[in-house]
Swiss-Prot record:
It comes from the Eukaryota. Expressed in shoot apex, primary root tip, trichomes of young leaves, leaf vascular tissues, anther filaments and styles. Detected in inflorescences, leaves, stems, roots and siliques. Mostly expressed in floral organs, and, at low levels, in other organs. The lineage of its organism: Eukaryota, Viridiplantae, Streptophyta, Embryophyta, Tracheophyta. Fe cation binds at H309, E311, H397. The gene is JMJ14. This is Lysine-specific demethylase JMJ14. Changing H397A: Loss of demethylation activity. GO terms for molecular function: DNA-binding transcription factor activity; histone H3K4 demethylase activity; histone H3K4me/H3K4me2/H3K4me3 demethylase activity; histone methyltransferase activity; transcription cis-regulatory region binding; zinc ion binding. GO terms for biological process: circadian rhythm; developmental growth; flower development; L-pipecolic acid biosynthetic process; negative regulation of DNA-templated transcription; negative regulation of flower development; negative regulation of gene expression, epigenetic; negative regulation of long-day photoperiodism, flowering. PANTHER family: LYSINE-SPECIFIC DEMETHYLASE, LYSINE-SPECIFIC DEMETHYLASE JMJ14. The record marks F171, V363 as: Involved in histone H3A7 recognition.
């Protein structure tokens, strides 16, 4: 006890020193100044105010359930969302080690605290009113250093109340502690508070120690909040950045021997991983936002409080209690959030009149008893060490700690959050409140990822866990589809509402990469669109406040758009399952955002229960991930051109069906020096997006020496700039590895070729890993079920580098597109300026597979001796005889009396007329007879008899 009292005395002396410095700046005089720690308040069990509320649900996931954190959240949402919060108890085997307990951290690392005045959380006077009072009942009121909570720094001390306009009730900065010291101080506090017969400085007998139960602590806590008779001050280590202090979960250390901690470091329930798991849209936020994506640590003591609040952007939150005493939570269902806010304003009118955003400050409590009286449902959860608490979107929650403990929390955003997040940012705009992240960036990132997964699924029919998750939120009724459609409708309405005075420009790809772009008036995020003017090119407005930006003439004002409305509606159709739209946006994912599609990011699909090591990427996959990350920045600059480019419509067939066309014509952005075609509103007050055009101000330099050398090497590989020579040389090098087997169904042939199942060939071509060298590619035909044949091209030495499509031509287009990306990485100039790459544009996929090579054709045709694939053989007959068969109802030239070609001799003209009258089947049979290919002996005998009769006839 002496040791605890000594520690408390040193803490109080430090606190007193800080308060004395505040006193000198304050206009109010304290009644007394303590020279020793005084915890004068005592437990009063007879006046306990424990609220009568129902308990929130508790869930006990099985090991299988625990494998997929987001899947489990999705599973329990329907059962728990109506409570606002729930408790999750992990399987018994899941017990991650806590690095915070290591001696170097536990005894040596210090963290800052805040002083909380528990008796003032609900019952206090407004700041302005309290500063006018000359005499205070409580000595400390004059010493409160008013603070403002910031997500970035946690606690930012203001000017100690010297200015009424600046002072806001909050948490005063307290002393720094180590975890060991804080635990001892909490023990001292509880011994003093709950054992009134002992003086704080005397020894307490072990048999007299009393450990209050949770219900005792809860009753006393709300007595202090509702009807305090004494001053109760505690400390709270809140909002501690884990990047600085350290996380309570182990982190993976590459290069070190694998241990038990490493298994937990890669677990999905490790809060360092949770926010960016596959399926959480926060995965598309590239910045490590402290408190949202990077967890915060919370070190509590008895009665330390987290006041009523809702998560930023109405996100889900997950809290894990690493060690220590329980934490009592209270939750309100999200659909009662507005009712809760109204009750708070009704019961605390003076505080809200002075500070309308009071609920954003996390400094005010209101008893669950009062809330229930007003008809607001409240639920309780008691979290113990090793357990999780999940809060749902827009669910207000609060609580207090029963003693010393360490907890960690982070946000997560499954797809069902998107509708809540959209409502949040629209509300922030009306309140003119800054946001923590870009909702539109997350929405578009999720939509593009889902589209790419749909594209992969349409080709391979393989449902990986990631693809299956995105597939579930698509279709017309899918959660993601609905969220994107709603946002596109909003964007269209806002564009159409701007009736005059604005031209449209294409937004730069990196418009908001290096700095946040927000509306000058309401702070709305401007990732999707922004309004500006030549008079203030670095000042922007949202579409709602576009007309409030300035009063300049219409010719000087413009709107920047990241995607046209046609493109956005195509994205909606893609999510609904339209194959053409899927193809278009999958191409955009590959070409425009190569660092964002799944193949580049290569998820580590995290497991647990207990944590299973995540699947590692091969060296090739890791190299591809790193390379594409570097290429993406270069790609953004390459896709611009120094000439004006007309943006193609979504409906254009060449854009829909060929990714390379959208790559050539896409423009990432402009600045104020760009030439812009003004686009006025058309009939009905709508923008005519067909007229949007832009001109880049950054023409690329072609002076790079390394690029020149690369061009020479590429020329050498392709056989020079002669396109025909290059492709001819490549076609001759096709090696047939397997002819496969015939499939007599639609789609398994075309007019140009037969596609045997299991067909496999080898060809040399520029390497997608190193374009300066040739490598072997394996081309094969697989069975994709109802889709028919699936064409796949893979690098022979690195099979994980593969490209698949339902079209042989497009399959090789994907290879050439990848080649362009690799060349961009090595060459600092546009692909369009590399004339040596022109042969890439003429590469024929059928030829690269070998389907146009004579030796391959002969082998493949032998698989169909009966000519069952009529589409192919009919076209072949036409080519052989040089005449189209006469369609039913048509007449040939001779019947019409048309003149015959005089250059042909009489016999040829007669033969051509005869052949035109034949059906395709008859032509094929005749060809077989004349060439000796038919095996039908009866037909051969009939033909011989016919010839004999013709010779006998006069």
């Amino acid at each position: 006890m002496d040791q605890l009292a000594s520690l408390a005395e040193s803490v109080a002396m430090e606190e007193d020193s800080e308060k004395q410095s505040i006193k000198g700046e304050s206009s109010l005089e304290p009644d007394s100044t303590p020279s020793s720690p005084k915890i004068t308040a005592r437990w009063n069990p007879s006046e306990a105010c424990r609220p009568l509320v129902d308990d929130a649900p508790i869930f006990y996931p099985t090991n299988e359930d625990f494998d997929d954190p987001l899947g489990y959240i999705e599973k329990l949402r329907s059962k728990a969302e109506s409570y606002g919060i729930c408790r999750i108890v992990p399987p018994v085997a899941w017990r991650p080690p806590c690095p915070l307990k290591e001696k170097k951290i536990w005894e040596n690392s210090k963290f800052p605290t805040r002083i909380q005045f528990i008796d003032l959380l609900q019952n206090r006077e407004p700041i302005k009113k309290s500063t006018k009072t000359k005499k205070r009942k409580r000595r400390r009121i004059s010493k409160i250093g008013y603070t403002r909570r910031k997500r970035d720094s946690g606690c930012d001390t203001a000017s100690s109340g010297s200015s009424d306009s600046e002072g806001k009730f909050g948490f005063q900065t307290g002393p720094d502690f180590t975890l060991e010291e804080f635990q001892k101080y909490d023990e001292y506090f509880k011994e003093c508070y709950f054992q009134s017969e002992d003086h704080p400085g005397s020894k307490a007998s072990e048999n007299k120690k009393f450990k209050p139960k949770v219900k005792d602590l809860e009753g006393e806590y709300w007595r202090i909040v509702e009807q305090a008779t004494d001053e109760v001050e505690v400390y709270y280590g809140a909002d501690l950045e884990t990047k600085k202090f350290g996380s309570g979960f182990p982190k993976y250390k590459p290069g070190y021997p694998i241990s038990e901690a490493d298994q937990y470091s890669q677990c999905g329930w490790n809060l360092n991983n949770l926010s960016r798991l596959p399926g959480s849209v926060l995965a598309f936020e590239s910045c490590d936002i402290s408190g949202v994506i990077v967890p915060w640590l919370y070190v509590g003591m008895c009665f330390s409080t987290f006041c009523w609040h809702v998560e930023d952007h109405h996100l889900y939150s997950m809290n894990y209690l690493h060690t220590g005493d329980p934490k009592v939570w209270y939750g309100i269902p999200g659909n009662h959030a507005e009712s809760f806010e109204n009750v708070m304003k009704k019961r605390l009118p003076d505080l809200f009149e002075e500070q309308p955003d009071l609920l954003h400050q996390l400094v005010t409590q209101l008893s669950p008893r009062i809330l229930k009286e007003e008809g607001v449902p409240v639920y309780r959860a008691v979290q113990r060490s090793g357990e999780f608490i999940l809060t749902f979107p827009k669910a207000y929650h609060s609580g207090f700690n029963c003693g010393f403990n360490c907890a960690e929390a982070v946000n997560v955003a499954p797809v069902d959050w998107l509708v809540h997040g959209q409502n949040a940012v629209e509300g922030y705009s009306k309140q003119r409140r800054k946001s923590s992240l870009s909702h539109d960036k997350l929405l578009l990132g999720a939509a593009m990822e889902a589209t790419y997964c749909l594209w992969e699924l349409s080709l391979s029919k393989k449902k990986t866990p990631v693809i299956a998750r995105w597939k579930r939120v698509c279709s017309e009724d899918g959660l993601l589809t609905k969220a994107v459609k709603k946002r596109v409708q909003m964007e269209e309405e806002r564009l159409n509402h701007l009736q005059d005075g604005f031209s449209l420009r294409k937004m730069e790809g990196d418009f908001d990469n290096k700095r946040e772009r927000e509306c000058f008036l309401c702070f709305y995020d401007l990732h999707m669109s922004a309004s500006s003017c030549k008079c203030s090119p670095n000042r922007f407005a949202c579409l709602i406040h576009a007309k409030d930006l300035c009063s300049c003439e219409s010719k000087d004002r413009y709107i920047l758009i990241r995607h046209t409305l046609d493109e956005l509606w195509a994205l909606v159709r893609a999510l609904e399952g339209d194959l053409d739209a899927i193809d278009l946006w999958a191409s955009k994912c590959r070409d425009q955002y190569p660092s964002q599609h799944p193949r580049a990011r290569e998820y580590a699909y995290l497991k647990s229960a207990p944590c299973i090591k995540s699947r590692g990427s091969s060296k090739v996959q890791q190299r591809e991930q790193n390379n594409l990350q570097l290429v993406s920045e270069r790609l953004q600059s390459d896709l611009t051109s120094n000439k004006e480019v007309q943006l193609k419509q979504d409906g254009d067939s060449d854009v829909n069906r060929h990714g390379h066309e959208s790559e050539r014509n896409h423009v990432h952005g402009i600045t104020d020096k760009s030439a812009v075609t003004d686009v006025k509103l058309g009939v009905g007050g709508k923008f005519d997006e067909k007229k949007i055009s832009v001109e880049s101000q950054n023409p690329h330099s072609v002076s790079d020496v390394g690029c020149s050398e690369l061009a020479k090497k590429v020329d050498g590989c392709l056989g020079g700039k002669d396109q025909n020579a290059a492709t001819n040389r490549l076609s001759l090098s096709v090696e047939l590895l397997s002819s496969g087997s015939l499939v007599v169904k639609k789609l398994w042939c075309s007019k140009q070729a037969i596609y045997p199942k299991g067909f496999k060939s080898r060809v040399k071509f520029l390497s997608v890993l190193d374009p300066t060298n040739l490598t072997n590619y394996i081309s094969e035909v697989l069975d994709a079920g109802l889709l028919g044949p699936l064409f796949r091209v893979s690098v022979e030495d690195y099979p994980t580098e593969n490209f698949s499509n339902v079209s042989a031509e497009k399959c090789w287009q994907m290879v050439t597109q990848r080649l362009k990306l690799e060349i961009i990485k090595k060459c600092d100039q546009p692909v369009s300026s590399l004339t040596s790459l022109q042969p890439l544009e003429s590469i024929n996929g059928l030829e690269m597979f070998g389907f146009l090579s004579p030796h391959v054709i002969k082998v493949v045709e032998a698989l169909d001796p009966k000519h069952q694939l009529e589409e192919y053989w009919n076209q072949k007959a036409v080519k052989l005889f040089g005449a189209e068969p006469i369609k039913e109802g048509e007449k040939d030239d001779t019947e019409k009396g048309g003149a015959s070609d005089p250059s042909l001799d009489r016999d040829t003209r007669l033969l051509r007329g005869l052949l035109k009258k034949a059906t395709p089947e008859e032509l094929v049979m005749m060809h077989g007879l004349l060439c000796g290919e038919t095996r039908n002996t009866e037909l051969k005998e009939e033909l011989s008899t016919l010839v004999d009769k013709m010779e006998i006839s006069p």
